[in-house]
UniProtKB/Swiss-Prot annotation:
One of its GO terms (cellular component) is cytosol. This is Threonine--tRNA ligase. SMART domains: tRNA_SAD (SM00863). NCBIfam families: thrS (TIGR00418). It comes from the Bacteria. Keywords: Aminoacyl-tRNA synthetase, ATP-binding, Cytoplasm, Ligase, Metal-binding, Nucleotide-binding, Protein biosynthesis, RNA-binding, tRNA-binding, Zinc. Binds 1 zinc ion per subunit. GO terms for biological process: threonyl-tRNA aminoacylation. It is found in: Cytoplasm. Homodimer.
Amino acid sequence: MPIITLPDGSQRSFDHPVSVAEVAQSIGAGLAKATLAGKVDGRLVDACDTIDRDATLQIITPKDEEGLEIIRHSCAHLVGHAVKQLYPTAKMVIGPVIEEGFYYDIFFERPFTPEDMAAIQQRMRELIDKDYDVIKKMTPRAEVIELFKSRGEDYKLRLIDDMPDEKAMGLYFHEEYVDMCRGPHVPNTRFLKAFQLTKISGAYWRGDSKNEQLQRIYGTAWADKKQLAAYIQRIEEAEKRDHRRIGKQLDLFHLQEEAPGMVFWHPNGWSVYQVLEQYMRKVQRDHGYVEVRTPQVVDRILWERSGHWSNYAENMFTTSSESRDYAVKPMNCPCHVQIFNQGLKSYRDLPLRLAEFGACHRNEPSGALHGIMRVRGFTQDDAHIFCTEEQVKKEAADFIKLTLQVYRDFGFTDIAMKLSTRPAKRVGSDELWDRAEGALADALNESGLAWEYQPGEGAFYGPKIEFTLKDCLGRNWQCGTLQYDPNLPERLDASYIAEDNNRKRPVMLHRAILGSFERFIGMLIEHYAGAFPAWLAPTQAVVMNITDKQADFAAEVVRILGESGFRAKSDLRNEKIGFKIREHTLLKVPYLLVIGDREVESKAVAVRTREGEDLGSMPVTQFAELLAQAVSRRGRQDSE
Protein backbone atom coordinates (compact mmCIF):
# COMPACT_ATOMS: atom_id res chain seq x y z
CA MET A 1 0.00 0.00 0.00
CA PRO A 2 1.25 3.51 -0.76
CA ILE A 3 3.85 5.39 1.22
CA ILE A 4 3.52 9.11 0.46
CA THR A 5 6.65 11.28 0.76
CA LEU A 6 5.93 14.98 1.36
CA PRO A 7 8.15 17.94 0.37
CA ASP A 8 9.63 18.20 3.89
CA GLY A 9 10.80 14.57 3.67
CA SER A 10 8.18 13.21 6.07
CA GLN A 11 6.23 10.12 5.05
CA ARG A 12 2.69 8.89 5.52
CA SER A 13 1.59 5.30 5.03
CA PHE A 14 -1.87 4.24 3.93
CA ASP A 15 -3.38 0.75 3.80
CA HIS A 16 -5.44 1.55 0.70
CA PRO A 17 -5.23 3.71 -2.46
CA VAL A 18 -5.65 7.30 -1.33
CA SER A 19 -6.69 10.52 -3.05
CA VAL A 20 -4.73 13.75 -2.91
CA ALA A 21 -7.59 15.28 -0.92
CA GLU A 22 -7.48 12.43 1.62
CA VAL A 23 -3.74 12.89 2.12
CA ALA A 24 -4.33 16.59 2.73
CA GLN A 25 -7.09 15.75 5.23
CA SER A 26 -4.73 13.42 7.09
CA ILE A 27 -2.31 16.33 7.52
CA GLY A 28 -4.88 18.84 8.70
CA ALA A 29 -8.35 20.27 8.11
CA GLY A 30 -6.95 23.67 7.10
CA LEU A 31 -4.77 22.18 4.39
CA ALA A 32 -7.61 19.99 3.18
CA LYS A 33 -9.86 23.03 2.79
CA ALA A 34 -7.16 24.85 0.78
CA THR A 35 -6.26 21.92 -1.47
CA LEU A 36 -6.74 22.54 -5.17
CA ALA A 37 -4.76 19.69 -6.67
CA GLY A 38 -1.59 17.69 -6.19
CA LYS A 39 1.73 17.08 -7.85
CA VAL A 40 2.47 13.35 -7.78
CA ASP A 41 6.05 12.48 -8.74
CA GLY A 42 6.21 15.89 -10.43
CA ARG A 43 2.96 15.49 -12.41
CA LEU A 44 -0.10 17.66 -11.72
CA VAL A 45 -3.26 15.71 -10.85
CA ASP A 46 -6.72 16.54 -9.53
CA ALA A 47 -7.46 16.51 -5.81
CA CYS A 48 -9.82 13.58 -6.40
CA ASP A 49 -7.20 11.46 -8.19
CA THR A 50 -5.98 8.42 -6.26
CA ILE A 51 -2.45 7.28 -5.57
CA ASP A 52 -2.00 3.50 -5.41
CA ARG A 53 1.80 3.23 -5.17
CA ASP A 54 4.69 4.81 -3.31
CA ALA A 55 5.07 8.39 -4.53
CA THR A 56 6.18 11.91 -3.73
CA LEU A 57 3.36 14.40 -3.28
CA GLN A 58 3.15 18.18 -3.16
CA ILE A 59 -0.24 19.58 -2.19
CA ILE A 60 -1.17 22.47 -4.50
CA THR A 61 -3.02 25.41 -2.93
CA PRO A 62 -3.95 28.89 -4.24
CA LYS A 63 -0.61 30.15 -2.92
CA ASP A 64 1.27 28.10 -5.54
CA GLU A 65 1.86 29.32 -9.09
CA GLU A 66 0.34 26.07 -10.37
CA GLY A 67 -2.66 26.72 -8.14
CA LEU A 68 -3.23 30.10 -9.72
CA GLU A 69 -3.18 28.53 -13.19
CA ILE A 70 -5.72 25.92 -12.07
CA ILE A 71 -8.02 28.66 -10.73
CA ARG A 72 -7.78 30.53 -14.04
CA HIS A 73 -8.42 27.41 -16.11
CA SER A 74 -11.44 26.55 -13.99
CA CYS A 75 -12.75 30.10 -14.40
CA ALA A 76 -12.64 29.58 -18.16
CA HIS A 77 -14.88 26.53 -17.70
CA LEU A 78 -17.15 28.65 -15.50
CA VAL A 79 -17.50 31.11 -18.39
CA GLY A 80 -18.76 28.17 -20.44
CA HIS A 81 -21.27 27.22 -17.75
CA ALA A 82 -22.64 30.76 -17.56
CA VAL A 83 -22.73 31.29 -21.34
CA LYS A 84 -24.60 28.03 -21.99
CA GLN A 85 -27.19 28.91 -19.35
CA LEU A 86 -27.75 32.38 -20.79
CA TYR A 87 -27.27 31.61 -24.49
CA PRO A 88 -28.04 27.90 -25.05
CA THR A 89 -27.33 28.04 -28.81
CA ALA A 90 -23.74 29.22 -28.28
CA LYS A 91 -21.08 26.68 -29.21
CA MET A 92 -18.03 26.40 -26.99
CA VAL A 93 -14.57 26.11 -28.54
CA ILE A 94 -11.50 26.35 -26.26
CA GLY A 95 -10.71 28.08 -22.97
CA PRO A 96 -7.00 28.16 -22.12
CA VAL A 97 -4.97 29.95 -19.47
CA ILE A 98 -2.91 32.96 -20.58
CA GLU A 99 -0.58 35.27 -18.67
CA GLU A 100 -2.48 36.69 -15.69
CA GLY A 101 -5.80 35.35 -16.91
CA PHE A 102 -7.79 33.19 -19.28
CA TYR A 103 -10.13 33.36 -22.24
CA TYR A 104 -12.85 31.31 -23.86
CA ASP A 105 -13.52 31.24 -27.61
CA ILE A 106 -17.21 30.93 -28.45
CA PHE A 107 -19.25 30.73 -31.65
CA PHE A 108 -22.53 32.66 -31.40
CA GLU A 109 -24.88 33.97 -34.06
CA ARG A 110 -24.53 37.60 -32.99
CA PRO A 111 -21.79 39.70 -31.39
CA PHE A 112 -21.75 39.79 -27.61
CA THR A 113 -22.37 43.28 -26.19
CA PRO A 114 -21.02 44.89 -23.02
CA GLU A 115 -24.44 44.15 -21.50
CA ASP A 116 -23.98 40.48 -22.39
CA MET A 117 -20.58 40.44 -20.71
CA ALA A 118 -22.04 42.00 -17.55
CA ALA A 119 -24.78 39.35 -17.55
CA ILE A 120 -22.24 36.53 -18.02
CA GLN A 121 -20.12 37.87 -15.15
CA GLN A 122 -23.16 38.15 -12.88
CA ARG A 123 -24.25 34.60 -13.70
CA MET A 124 -20.72 33.36 -12.93
CA ARG A 125 -20.92 35.00 -9.49
CA GLU A 126 -24.30 33.37 -8.88
CA LEU A 127 -22.87 29.97 -9.83
CA ILE A 128 -19.89 30.48 -7.52
CA ASP A 129 -22.25 31.31 -4.66
CA LYS A 130 -23.89 27.90 -5.13
CA ASP A 131 -20.61 26.43 -3.86
CA TYR A 132 -20.96 23.30 -5.98
CA ASP A 133 -18.36 20.59 -6.50
CA VAL A 134 -16.65 20.21 -9.86
CA ILE A 135 -16.86 16.52 -10.79
CA LYS A 136 -14.20 14.78 -12.87
CA LYS A 137 -14.96 11.65 -14.90
CA MET A 138 -12.48 9.82 -17.10
CA THR A 139 -14.69 8.74 -19.99
CA PRO A 140 -14.14 6.41 -22.98
CA ARG A 141 -13.62 8.22 -26.27
CA ALA A 142 -16.81 6.88 -27.88
CA GLU A 143 -18.94 8.12 -24.96
CA VAL A 144 -17.32 11.55 -25.11
CA ILE A 145 -18.13 11.80 -28.81
CA GLU A 146 -21.75 10.79 -28.21
CA LEU A 147 -22.08 13.27 -25.36
CA PHE A 148 -20.90 16.26 -27.41
CA LYS A 149 -22.92 15.12 -30.45
CA SER A 150 -26.06 15.10 -28.32
CA ARG A 151 -25.26 18.64 -27.14
CA GLY A 152 -24.47 19.95 -30.63
CA GLU A 153 -20.94 20.98 -29.63
CA ASP A 154 -19.40 20.80 -33.11
CA TYR A 155 -16.08 22.39 -32.15
CA LYS A 156 -15.52 19.92 -29.32
CA LEU A 157 -16.01 17.11 -31.85
CA ARG A 158 -13.42 18.70 -34.14
CA LEU A 159 -10.98 18.91 -31.23
CA ILE A 160 -11.54 15.22 -30.46
CA ASP A 161 -10.67 14.44 -34.10
CA ASP A 162 -7.33 16.17 -33.48
CA MET A 163 -6.54 13.61 -30.74
CA PRO A 164 -6.84 10.22 -32.47
CA ASP A 165 -4.65 8.43 -29.92
CA GLU A 166 -6.72 9.45 -26.88
CA LYS A 167 -8.73 6.40 -25.77
CA ALA A 168 -10.25 8.10 -22.72
CA MET A 169 -10.73 11.76 -21.90
CA GLY A 170 -11.27 13.84 -18.81
CA LEU A 171 -14.73 15.38 -18.53
CA TYR A 172 -15.33 18.06 -15.91
CA PHE A 173 -18.92 18.64 -14.84
CA HIS A 174 -20.11 22.01 -13.55
CA GLU A 175 -23.59 20.83 -12.62
CA GLU A 176 -25.36 20.32 -16.00
CA TYR A 177 -22.47 21.87 -17.98
CA VAL A 178 -19.64 19.62 -19.11
CA ASP A 179 -16.29 20.42 -20.69
CA MET A 180 -13.41 18.31 -21.93
CA CYS A 181 -9.96 18.90 -20.49
CA ARG A 182 -6.72 17.29 -19.32
CA GLY A 183 -7.03 19.25 -16.08
CA PRO A 184 -6.51 19.54 -13.24
CA HIS A 185 -9.35 21.78 -12.06
CA VAL A 186 -10.58 23.16 -8.76
CA PRO A 187 -12.66 20.71 -6.69
CA ASN A 188 -15.25 23.37 -5.82
CA THR A 189 -16.35 26.77 -7.14
CA ARG A 190 -15.52 28.47 -3.83
CA PHE A 191 -11.96 28.86 -5.14
CA LEU A 192 -13.12 31.06 -8.03
CA LYS A 193 -14.44 34.13 -6.20
CA ALA A 194 -11.59 36.50 -7.10
CA PHE A 195 -12.23 36.90 -10.81
CA GLN A 196 -13.30 39.56 -13.29
CA LEU A 197 -14.13 39.49 -16.99
CA THR A 198 -12.06 42.09 -18.80
CA LYS A 199 -12.93 42.35 -22.49
CA ILE A 200 -14.41 40.76 -25.61
CA SER A 201 -12.57 40.52 -28.92
CA GLY A 202 -12.74 38.64 -32.19
CA ALA A 203 -10.79 35.50 -33.00
CA TYR A 204 -10.70 32.90 -35.74
CA TRP A 205 -11.10 29.14 -35.48
CA ARG A 206 -7.57 27.72 -35.32
CA GLY A 207 -6.23 31.28 -35.64
CA ASP A 208 -6.77 31.28 -39.41
CA SER A 209 -8.57 34.29 -40.92
CA LYS A 210 -9.95 32.01 -43.65
CA ASN A 211 -12.00 30.18 -41.00
CA GLU A 212 -15.16 31.28 -39.23
CA GLN A 213 -14.97 34.12 -36.75
CA LEU A 214 -15.36 33.43 -33.06
CA GLN A 215 -15.80 35.66 -30.03
CA ARG A 216 -13.20 35.63 -27.30
CA ILE A 217 -14.19 36.50 -23.73
CA TYR A 218 -11.16 37.44 -21.61
CA GLY A 219 -10.94 37.41 -17.86
CA THR A 220 -8.53 37.40 -14.96
CA ALA A 221 -8.59 35.37 -11.75
CA TRP A 222 -6.50 35.40 -8.59
CA ALA A 223 -6.05 33.55 -5.35
CA ASP A 224 -7.95 36.16 -3.35
CA LYS A 225 -9.73 39.49 -3.74
CA LYS A 226 -6.73 41.45 -2.47
CA GLN A 227 -4.61 40.14 -5.36
CA LEU A 228 -7.46 40.87 -7.79
CA ALA A 229 -7.75 44.46 -6.54
CA ALA A 230 -3.99 44.96 -6.94
CA TYR A 231 -4.19 43.62 -10.49
CA ILE A 232 -7.11 45.89 -11.39
CA GLN A 233 -5.22 48.88 -9.99
CA ARG A 234 -2.19 47.91 -12.09
CA ILE A 235 -4.32 47.59 -15.22
CA GLU A 236 -5.91 50.99 -14.57
CA GLU A 237 -2.44 52.46 -14.23
CA ALA A 238 -1.40 50.74 -17.46
CA GLU A 239 -4.40 52.30 -19.23
CA LYS A 240 -3.30 55.74 -18.01
CA ARG A 241 0.15 54.99 -19.42
CA ASP A 242 -1.11 53.63 -22.75
CA HIS A 243 1.40 54.84 -25.34
CA ARG A 244 -1.38 55.59 -27.83
CA ARG A 245 -3.07 57.97 -25.39
CA ILE A 246 0.16 59.64 -24.29
CA GLY A 247 1.43 59.77 -27.88
CA LYS A 248 -1.56 61.93 -28.77
CA GLN A 249 -1.32 64.02 -25.59
CA LEU A 250 2.38 64.81 -26.17
CA ASP A 251 2.02 65.07 -29.97
CA LEU A 252 4.57 62.31 -30.59
CA PHE A 253 3.04 60.34 -33.47
CA HIS A 254 -0.15 59.17 -35.09
CA LEU A 255 -1.40 56.25 -37.17
CA GLN A 256 -4.15 56.33 -39.75
CA GLU A 257 -6.16 53.92 -41.86
CA GLU A 258 -4.50 54.89 -45.14
CA ALA A 259 -1.21 53.40 -43.89
CA PRO A 260 -2.10 50.63 -41.41
CA GLY A 261 0.75 49.68 -39.15
CA MET A 262 2.96 52.55 -40.37
CA VAL A 263 3.93 55.35 -38.01
CA PHE A 264 3.63 59.08 -38.77
CA TRP A 265 6.29 60.56 -36.50
CA HIS A 266 5.62 64.14 -35.39
CA PRO A 267 8.51 66.47 -34.47
CA ASN A 268 8.32 65.57 -30.76
CA GLY A 269 8.30 61.83 -31.40
CA TRP A 270 10.98 62.05 -34.07
CA SER A 271 13.16 63.88 -31.55
CA VAL A 272 12.95 60.88 -29.20
CA TYR A 273 13.63 58.54 -32.12
CA GLN A 274 16.72 60.53 -33.13
CA VAL A 275 18.12 60.48 -29.60
CA LEU A 276 17.79 56.69 -29.58
CA GLU A 277 19.43 56.31 -32.97
CA GLN A 278 22.31 58.67 -32.20
CA TYR A 279 22.88 56.98 -28.84
CA MET A 280 22.90 53.48 -30.38
CA ARG A 281 25.14 54.66 -33.24
CA LYS A 282 27.76 55.92 -30.78
CA VAL A 283 27.50 52.88 -28.50
CA GLN A 284 27.95 50.48 -31.41
CA ARG A 285 30.80 52.48 -32.93
CA ASP A 286 32.56 52.47 -29.55
CA HIS A 287 32.24 48.67 -29.47
CA GLY A 288 33.74 47.94 -32.86
CA TYR A 289 30.68 47.91 -35.12
CA VAL A 290 30.72 49.43 -38.60
CA GLU A 291 27.46 50.85 -39.90
CA VAL A 292 26.05 49.85 -43.29
CA ARG A 293 22.94 50.51 -45.34
CA THR A 294 21.22 47.94 -47.54
CA PRO A 295 18.33 48.11 -50.06
CA GLN A 296 14.73 47.85 -48.93
CA VAL A 297 13.50 46.13 -52.10
CA VAL A 298 15.38 42.98 -53.13
CA ASP A 299 14.83 40.38 -55.86
CA ARG A 300 12.89 37.27 -54.91
CA ILE A 301 15.93 35.16 -55.89
CA LEU A 302 17.86 36.22 -52.79
CA TRP A 303 14.91 35.40 -50.50
CA GLU A 304 14.64 31.98 -52.12
CA ARG A 305 18.32 31.29 -51.55
CA SER A 306 18.12 32.46 -47.94
CA GLY A 307 15.07 30.27 -47.27
CA HIS A 308 12.79 33.16 -46.34
CA TRP A 309 10.60 32.80 -49.42
CA SER A 310 9.51 29.26 -48.58
CA ASN A 311 9.03 29.96 -44.87
CA TYR A 312 8.02 33.60 -44.66
CA ALA A 313 6.52 34.68 -48.01
CA GLU A 314 3.03 35.33 -46.64
CA ASN A 315 4.49 37.92 -44.25
CA MET A 316 6.40 39.75 -46.99
CA PHE A 317 5.21 42.66 -49.11
CA THR A 318 5.96 41.96 -52.77
CA THR A 319 6.03 43.88 -56.02
CA SER A 320 6.97 43.28 -59.65
CA SER A 321 8.84 45.29 -62.24
CA GLU A 322 10.06 44.38 -65.73
CA SER A 323 9.02 40.74 -65.27
CA ARG A 324 10.98 40.37 -62.03
CA ASP A 325 9.52 39.68 -58.59
CA TYR A 326 10.77 41.65 -55.60
CA ALA A 327 10.12 41.67 -51.87
CA VAL A 328 10.33 44.53 -49.41
CA LYS A 329 12.79 43.21 -46.88
CA PRO A 330 11.28 41.88 -43.64
CA MET A 331 14.76 41.56 -42.12
CA ASN A 332 18.32 42.61 -42.87
CA CYS A 333 20.38 39.44 -42.49
CA PRO A 334 20.54 38.19 -46.12
CA CYS A 335 21.62 41.66 -47.26
CA HIS A 336 24.40 41.79 -44.67
CA VAL A 337 25.74 38.48 -45.98
CA GLN A 338 25.93 40.12 -49.43
CA ILE A 339 28.20 42.81 -47.98
CA PHE A 340 30.35 40.18 -46.28
CA ASN A 341 30.64 38.31 -49.59
CA GLN A 342 32.07 41.32 -51.43
CA GLY A 343 35.81 40.72 -51.62
CA LEU A 344 37.91 37.97 -50.11
CA LYS A 345 37.79 37.75 -46.32
CA SER A 346 40.58 36.40 -44.16
CA TYR A 347 40.47 35.08 -40.61
CA ARG A 348 42.33 38.31 -39.79
CA ASP A 349 39.20 40.28 -40.79
CA LEU A 350 37.12 38.48 -38.18
CA PRO A 351 35.14 39.25 -36.18
CA LEU A 352 33.36 41.61 -38.57
CA ARG A 353 30.45 43.44 -36.94
CA LEU A 354 27.99 44.97 -39.42
CA ALA A 355 25.28 47.21 -37.94
CA GLU A 356 22.29 48.80 -39.64
CA PHE A 357 19.31 50.84 -38.57
CA GLY A 358 17.37 48.80 -41.06
CA ALA A 359 13.89 49.80 -42.19
CA CYS A 360 11.89 46.56 -42.47
CA HIS A 361 8.30 45.73 -43.38
CA ARG A 362 6.23 42.71 -42.43
CA ASN A 363 2.68 42.01 -43.51
CA GLU A 364 1.24 41.52 -40.03
CA PRO A 365 -2.51 40.72 -39.81
CA SER A 366 -4.49 43.92 -39.29
CA GLY A 367 -6.06 42.48 -36.14
CA ALA A 368 -2.62 42.02 -34.57
CA LEU A 369 -1.56 45.66 -35.01
CA HIS A 370 -1.33 47.66 -31.77
CA GLY A 371 -0.26 51.30 -31.74
CA ILE A 372 3.48 51.49 -32.34
CA MET A 373 4.09 48.29 -30.38
CA ARG A 374 3.02 46.01 -33.25
CA VAL A 375 3.43 47.58 -36.67
CA ARG A 376 4.10 46.68 -40.29
CA GLY A 377 6.88 49.18 -40.92
CA PHE A 378 9.66 49.38 -38.33
CA THR A 379 13.36 50.02 -37.82
CA GLN A 380 15.64 47.52 -36.11
CA ASP A 381 18.89 48.25 -34.33
CA ASP A 382 20.16 45.26 -36.22
CA ALA A 383 23.68 43.87 -36.41
CA HIS A 384 25.37 40.70 -37.56
CA ILE A 385 28.69 39.48 -36.26
CA PHE A 386 30.67 37.26 -38.62
CA CYS A 387 33.21 35.31 -36.61
CA THR A 388 34.97 31.98 -36.17
CA GLU A 389 33.53 29.32 -33.90
CA GLU A 390 36.35 30.01 -31.43
CA GLN A 391 35.36 33.70 -31.23
CA VAL A 392 31.70 33.05 -30.38
CA LYS A 393 32.12 33.01 -26.59
CA LYS A 394 33.95 36.36 -26.43
CA GLU A 395 31.59 38.02 -28.90
CA ALA A 396 28.60 36.77 -26.93
CA ALA A 397 30.10 37.90 -23.61
CA ASP A 398 30.87 41.37 -25.01
CA PHE A 399 27.36 41.63 -26.43
CA ILE A 400 25.76 40.68 -23.10
CA LYS A 401 27.81 43.32 -21.30
CA LEU A 402 26.91 45.96 -23.90
CA THR A 403 23.21 45.06 -23.84
CA LEU A 404 22.95 45.31 -20.06
CA GLN A 405 24.69 48.69 -20.16
CA VAL A 406 22.21 49.99 -22.75
CA TYR A 407 19.22 48.81 -20.74
CA ARG A 408 20.54 50.49 -17.60
CA ASP A 409 20.96 53.73 -19.54
CA PHE A 410 17.27 53.58 -20.43
CA GLY A 411 16.26 52.95 -16.82
CA PHE A 412 15.70 49.17 -16.93
CA THR A 413 17.50 47.22 -14.22
CA ASP A 414 15.32 44.12 -13.79
CA ILE A 415 16.51 42.00 -16.71
CA ALA A 416 16.01 38.26 -17.22
CA MET A 417 18.32 36.32 -19.54
CA LYS A 418 17.38 32.98 -21.06
CA LEU A 419 19.24 30.49 -23.23
CA SER A 420 17.05 28.64 -25.72
CA THR A 421 18.56 25.25 -26.55
CA ARG A 422 18.25 22.64 -29.31
CA PRO A 423 14.77 21.66 -30.49
CA ALA A 424 13.81 18.12 -31.47
CA LYS A 425 13.82 19.02 -35.17
CA ARG A 426 17.19 20.54 -35.96
CA VAL A 427 20.12 20.54 -38.33
CA GLY A 428 23.74 20.02 -37.34
CA SER A 429 25.49 17.42 -35.22
CA ASP A 430 25.08 17.10 -31.47
CA GLU A 431 28.76 18.01 -31.15
CA LEU A 432 28.15 21.31 -32.95
CA TRP A 433 25.15 22.04 -30.74
CA ASP A 434 27.18 21.17 -27.62
CA ARG A 435 29.86 23.67 -28.59
CA ALA A 436 27.39 26.40 -29.55
CA GLU A 437 25.26 26.05 -26.41
CA GLY A 438 28.39 25.78 -24.28
CA ALA A 439 29.86 28.99 -25.69
CA LEU A 440 26.66 30.95 -25.04
CA ALA A 441 26.27 29.45 -21.55
CA ASP A 442 29.87 30.36 -20.69
CA ALA A 443 29.25 33.91 -21.91
CA LEU A 444 26.13 34.18 -19.73
CA ASN A 445 28.06 32.88 -16.73
CA GLU A 446 30.71 35.57 -17.27
CA SER A 447 28.03 38.23 -16.76
CA GLY A 448 27.79 37.18 -13.12
CA LEU A 449 23.99 37.41 -13.28
CA ALA A 450 21.33 34.75 -12.96
CA TRP A 451 19.97 33.20 -16.14
CA GLU A 452 17.93 30.17 -17.08
CA TYR A 453 17.57 27.58 -19.80
CA GLN A 454 14.61 27.31 -22.17
CA PRO A 455 15.02 23.69 -23.29
CA GLY A 456 13.97 22.97 -26.87
CA GLU A 457 13.15 26.62 -27.67
CA GLY A 458 16.11 27.34 -29.96
CA ALA A 459 15.84 27.78 -33.73
CA PHE A 460 16.31 24.65 -35.84
CA TYR A 461 19.83 25.82 -36.75
CA GLY A 462 21.20 27.20 -33.47
CA PRO A 463 20.72 28.31 -29.85
CA LYS A 464 19.63 31.80 -28.83
CA ILE A 465 19.96 34.18 -25.87
CA GLU A 466 16.92 36.33 -25.06
CA PHE A 467 16.75 39.41 -22.83
CA THR A 468 13.47 40.27 -21.10
CA LEU A 469 12.96 43.63 -19.35
CA LYS A 470 10.56 44.28 -16.50
CA ASP A 471 8.99 47.74 -16.51
CA CYS A 472 7.69 49.83 -13.60
CA LEU A 473 4.33 48.00 -13.74
CA GLY A 474 5.99 44.60 -13.49
CA ARG A 475 5.27 43.75 -17.13
CA ASN A 476 7.80 41.70 -19.08
CA TRP A 477 9.05 42.84 -22.48
CA GLN A 478 11.20 40.53 -24.59
CA CYS A 479 13.69 42.80 -26.38
CA GLY A 480 17.27 41.82 -27.09
CA THR A 481 18.39 38.63 -28.80
CA LEU A 482 21.60 36.92 -29.81
CA GLN A 483 21.02 34.11 -32.32
CA TYR A 484 23.78 31.65 -33.24
CA ASP A 485 23.50 30.82 -36.96
CA PRO A 486 25.78 28.60 -39.05
CA ASN A 487 22.92 28.03 -41.51
CA LEU A 488 22.57 31.32 -43.44
CA PRO A 489 26.31 31.58 -44.28
CA GLU A 490 26.00 28.08 -45.73
CA ARG A 491 22.89 28.92 -47.78
CA LEU A 492 24.36 32.17 -49.11
CA ASP A 493 27.88 30.79 -49.63
CA ALA A 494 29.72 33.05 -47.18
CA SER A 495 33.32 32.02 -46.51
CA TYR A 496 36.69 33.27 -45.32
CA ILE A 497 40.26 32.05 -45.73
CA ALA A 498 41.29 30.32 -42.52
CA GLU A 499 44.78 30.26 -41.04
CA ASP A 500 45.50 27.00 -42.89
CA ASN A 501 44.61 28.70 -46.23
CA ASN A 502 41.41 26.66 -46.60
CA ARG A 503 37.97 28.20 -47.05
CA LYS A 504 35.68 27.97 -44.02
CA ARG A 505 32.17 29.14 -43.21
CA PRO A 506 31.91 31.90 -40.64
CA VAL A 507 29.44 31.67 -37.78
CA MET A 508 26.85 34.43 -38.01
CA LEU A 509 25.54 35.97 -34.80
CA HIS A 510 22.28 37.86 -35.35
CA ARG A 511 21.85 40.43 -32.59
CA ALA A 512 19.56 43.26 -31.59
CA ILE A 513 19.36 45.22 -28.35
CA LEU A 514 16.31 47.47 -28.62
CA GLY A 515 14.53 45.22 -31.11
CA SER A 516 12.44 47.67 -33.10
CA PHE A 517 12.70 51.40 -32.40
CA GLU A 518 8.93 51.75 -32.61
CA ARG A 519 8.19 49.10 -30.00
CA PHE A 520 11.00 50.26 -27.71
CA ILE A 521 9.77 53.86 -27.82
CA GLY A 522 6.28 52.56 -26.99
CA MET A 523 7.78 50.76 -24.00
CA LEU A 524 9.61 53.90 -22.89
CA ILE A 525 6.44 55.99 -23.17
CA GLU A 526 4.55 53.57 -20.92
CA HIS A 527 7.47 52.96 -18.53
CA TYR A 528 7.90 56.70 -17.91
CA ALA A 529 4.22 57.60 -18.46
CA GLY A 530 5.52 60.12 -21.00
CA ALA A 531 7.73 61.86 -18.41
CA PHE A 532 10.96 61.03 -20.23
CA PRO A 533 14.29 61.59 -18.49
CA ALA A 534 15.89 64.84 -19.59
CA TRP A 535 18.18 63.21 -22.17
CA LEU A 536 15.18 61.76 -24.06
CA ALA A 537 12.60 64.52 -23.58
CA PRO A 538 11.62 66.23 -26.86
CA THR A 539 11.76 69.58 -25.07
CA GLN A 540 14.19 69.62 -22.17
CA ALA A 541 13.35 73.11 -20.92
CA VAL A 542 10.67 75.68 -21.66
CA VAL A 543 11.32 79.37 -20.96
CA MET A 544 8.25 81.39 -19.91
CA ASN A 545 7.93 85.14 -19.46
CA ILE A 546 5.55 86.78 -17.02
CA THR A 547 4.98 89.90 -19.15
CA ASP A 548 6.04 91.09 -22.58
CA LYS A 549 8.90 93.04 -21.00
CA GLN A 550 10.85 89.80 -20.47
CA ALA A 551 10.33 88.42 -24.01
CA ASP A 552 13.74 89.48 -25.34
CA PHE A 553 15.64 87.91 -22.45
CA ALA A 554 13.54 84.74 -22.71
CA ALA A 555 14.54 84.44 -26.37
CA GLU A 556 18.17 85.02 -25.36
CA VAL A 557 18.00 82.17 -22.81
CA VAL A 558 16.59 79.81 -25.46
CA ARG A 559 19.42 80.80 -27.80
CA ILE A 560 22.09 80.19 -25.15
CA LEU A 561 20.67 76.77 -24.25
CA GLY A 562 20.30 75.83 -27.92
CA GLU A 563 23.92 76.73 -28.63
CA SER A 564 24.89 74.45 -25.73
CA GLY A 565 23.14 71.55 -27.46
CA PHE A 566 19.94 71.51 -25.43
CA ARG A 567 16.38 71.31 -26.73
CA ALA A 568 14.72 74.43 -25.32
CA LYS A 569 11.83 76.58 -26.47
CA SER A 570 10.04 79.69 -25.28
CA ASP A 571 6.41 80.32 -24.40
CA LEU A 572 5.81 84.04 -24.86
CA ARG A 573 2.02 83.92 -25.02
CA ASN A 574 0.03 86.58 -23.24
CA GLU A 575 -1.26 84.11 -20.64
CA LYS A 576 -0.98 84.00 -16.87
CA ILE A 577 2.22 82.31 -15.71
CA GLY A 578 0.27 79.78 -13.64
CA PHE A 579 -1.59 78.69 -16.77
CA LYS A 580 1.67 78.26 -18.68
CA ILE A 581 3.25 76.26 -15.86
CA ARG A 582 0.26 73.92 -15.65
CA GLU A 583 0.19 73.40 -19.41
CA HIS A 584 3.88 72.53 -19.72
CA THR A 585 3.69 70.35 -16.63
CA LEU A 586 0.98 68.34 -18.39
CA LEU A 587 3.25 68.20 -21.44
CA LYS A 588 5.84 66.67 -19.09
CA VAL A 589 8.68 69.09 -19.90
CA PRO A 590 11.45 68.31 -17.35
CA TYR A 591 12.41 71.91 -16.51
CA LEU A 592 10.19 75.01 -16.44
CA LEU A 593 12.11 78.31 -16.46
CA VAL A 594 10.23 81.43 -15.36
CA ILE A 595 11.53 84.92 -16.15
CA GLY A 596 10.27 88.05 -14.41
CA ASP A 597 11.79 91.48 -13.98
CA ARG A 598 14.18 90.28 -11.26
CA GLU A 599 15.50 87.49 -13.49
CA VAL A 600 16.07 89.94 -16.36
CA GLU A 601 17.93 92.24 -14.00
CA SER A 602 20.17 89.48 -12.60
CA LYS A 603 20.46 87.52 -15.88
CA ALA A 604 19.00 84.48 -14.14
CA VAL A 605 16.12 82.03 -14.46
CA ALA A 606 13.72 80.74 -11.81
CA VAL A 607 13.78 76.94 -12.16
CA ARG A 608 10.96 74.52 -11.42
CA THR A 609 10.75 70.82 -12.23
CA ARG A 610 7.71 69.14 -13.73
CA GLU A 611 7.26 67.37 -10.38
CA GLY A 612 6.65 70.81 -8.82
CA GLU A 613 10.01 71.21 -7.05
CA ASP A 614 11.19 74.84 -6.84
CA LEU A 615 14.96 74.90 -7.44
CA GLY A 616 15.16 78.66 -6.98
CA SER A 617 16.75 81.34 -9.13
CA MET A 618 20.13 80.70 -10.77
CA PRO A 619 22.32 82.10 -13.56
CA VAL A 620 21.65 80.63 -17.00
CA THR A 621 25.11 79.03 -17.03
CA GLN A 622 24.39 77.28 -13.72
CA PHE A 623 21.12 75.91 -15.07
CA ALA A 624 22.94 74.69 -18.18
CA GLU A 625 25.33 72.77 -15.91
CA LEU A 626 22.37 71.31 -13.97
CA LEU A 627 20.71 70.22 -17.22
CA ALA A 628 23.96 68.76 -18.54
CA GLN A 629 24.27 66.63 -15.39
CA ALA A 630 20.69 65.41 -15.77
CA VAL A 631 21.30 64.52 -19.42
CA SER A 632 24.54 62.70 -18.60
CA ARG A 633 22.69 60.48 -16.10
CA ARG A 634 20.44 59.34 -18.94
CA GLY A 635 17.80 57.05 -17.42
CA ARG A 636 19.98 55.66 -14.65
CA GLN A 637 18.90 55.92 -11.06
CA ASP A 638 20.81 58.34 -8.85
CA SER A 639 22.27 55.44 -6.86
CA GLU A 640 23.84 53.83 -9.94
